[in-house]
From Swiss-Prot:
Protein family (similarity comment): Belongs to the GTP-dependent DPCK family.
Top-level division of the source organism's lineage: Archaea
Full protein name: GTP-dependent dephospho-CoA kinase
Classification lineage: Archaea, Methanobacteriati, Methanobacteriota, Methanomada group, Methanococci
Reactions catalysed: 3'-dephospho-CoA + GTP = GDP + CoA + H(+)
EC number: 2.7.1.237
Pfam families reported for this sequence: DUF359 (PF04019)
Gene Ontology molecular function terms on file: GTP binding; kinase activity
Amino acid sequence: MYILTDKVATELKKPFGKVYKELNSIEGKVISIGDVTTKHLLSNGIVPDLSILDFKTKRNVPVEIPHKFKTVFEVYNPPGYISDEAIERIKYLSTIDDRDMALIVKGEEDLLTLPVIKYFPEDTSVIYGQPDEGMVVLKITKELKQKIEKLLKDMEER
C-alpha cells in the first residue's frame, strides 16, 4: 500500500501530458481515469478499454454515467492511498485484452493513474482529468514508467 506524501502531491498537481478541453478521437488502447473524463469520452463515441470510476467528481459531487459496461470489477481504495487490492486488480486488468471494462472504486480513483502507468504496456493512452483545466492525454513510454517508479518510491509504503 502506498500513502500520498506532500512531495508527491505537489508533483501530481502538474499535468503529465498535454491538456485538452475536447477530445473527439484517439487511437489504440485507451484507459480513462475519472468520471468526468470517462463521461466526456463516452459522449463523443470513444469507448475506453478500461474506465476507472468512483461516480463522484471533486470528491463528493455525484456523476451519472449513462453507459452499461461490458465487464465490471470493483475495488476498495481510500482517498490519499493506493491500496494493495487496487494494485493487484490493475495488474490483472493490464493482462486482459478486452474493451469496455470498468473498475468501480469504492473510495477514490485519482491516484490509480500511477499503477495504471506502471503496469499497462507502452503505447497505451491514458486520459485523466486535470481539475478545472480539462483532460490530460498521455502515451505510456519507458521514460514515463521511470518517472512513475520514482514517484511511487517517494510515497510512504506500508
